[in-house]
A protein has these predicted regions:
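Catalytic cores of nuclease domains that cleave nucleic-acid phosphodiester backbones
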Residues: 1-40
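Conserved helix-adjacent loop modules within structured domains
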Residues: 36, 42-49
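Short acidic/His/Gly/Ser-rich catalytic and metal-binding motifs that mark active-site loops
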Residues: 37-41, 89-92
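Metal-dependent nuclease catalytic regions and adjoining charged, substrate-binding loops involved
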Residues: 47-52, 57-151
Length: 151
């Protein structure tokens, strides 16, 4: 899906699998992931690789696509990650995003004392970098003149 907008910024996404159920009037987005630790996907991939951002954007892409295709009355189901084991030992698992995880992906969240930025903050940071043509330092560190407080 190319050319959909989130907070004034244009995106494109290439989803692995999309199922349109015309009888139930639903659209389901799937993303395929292969990892060495299927049961630790949440901490070792979803958080570490920021897959929550991908899930959020795929959902927005599916909403835009459905509207363009004349399926605006279809329910866009929350994304699912189909996770397989790279060693082919463990069975695959399906991880389903929830409304809470979508809200976290949008707004950012904390997990085990670590902050994870949301799409809203990231797009704001990107807009700031575009507007100011500053790419070699984060907005936060720029605004504090490069002074970072410890502890």
């Amino acid at each position: 899906m190319e050319g959909y907008e989130v907070f004034g910024h244009m995106f494109k996404s290439m989803m692995d699998k999309v199922i349109v159920d015309h009888k139930a009037k639903t659209v389901q987005v799937y993303d395929l992931k292969c990892t060495w630790s299927v049961e630790n996907f949440y901490s070792e991939y979803y958080l570490y690789r920021r897959a929550y951002i991908q899930g959020f954007l795929y959902h927005k892409a599916a909403e835009s696509w459905a509207s363009e295709m004349g399926y605006g009355d279809y329910e866009i189901l929350l994304p699912k990650f189909i996770v397989c084991d790279s060693t082919n030992y463990s069975n695959p698992l399906v991880y389903s995003m929830t409304q809470d995880s979508m809200n976290n992906a949008l707004d950012g969240f904390e997990y085990k004392g670590r902050e994870y930025p949301g799409v809203a903050q990231l797009i704001g940071d990107l807009k700031w970098a575009l507007d100011n043509d500053v790419w070699n330092i984060s907005r936060e560190n720029y605004l504090t003149n490069g002074v970072v407080k410890l502890g």
